[in-house]
């Protein structure tokens, strides 16, 4: 009876250890994704020209904006 209890306890410890390792691996992956520079491909960049830019702009060009995502830029 003691042997059965010891084997059951050891089996539970092994199962808990495996779960802890899996959770730690997921936490490490999440931490790596949150660090800046880890994956810049999904980052969007936006550029806006101020109203008092050095070059005079026509009325249609005022507030011209460029949005770049994954290497594709489009003007708004």
Swiss-Prot record:
**Has UniProt tagged this entry with the keyword Signal?**
yes
Query: Where does the sequence pass through the membrane?
Result: none
Signal peptide limits:
1-22
Q: Which domain of life is it from?
A: Eukaryota
What the entry says about post-translational processing?
Answer: This is a cyclic peptide.
Q: What are the alphabetically sorted keywords of the record?
A: Antibiotic, Antimicrobial, Defensin, Disulfide bond, Fungicide, Signal
Q: Which GO terms describe its cellular component?
A: extracellular space
Q: Does the keyword Signal apply?
A: yes
Propeptide found at 23-64, 74-76
Any one of the GO BP annotations: disruption of plasma membrane integrity in another organism
- Which residue windows does the record flag with biased composition (Low complexity)? 30-44
Cysteine pairs forming cystine bridges in this chain are 68-73
Record's function text: Has antimicrobial activities against bacteria and fungi.
Instruction: Spell out the subunit comment.
Output: Forms a cyclic homodimer; disulfide-linked.
Q: Which family does it belong to?
A: Belongs to the alpha-defensin family. Theta subfamily.
Protein name as annotated: Demidefensin-3
Q: Which organism is it from?
A: Macaca mulatta (Rhesus macaque)
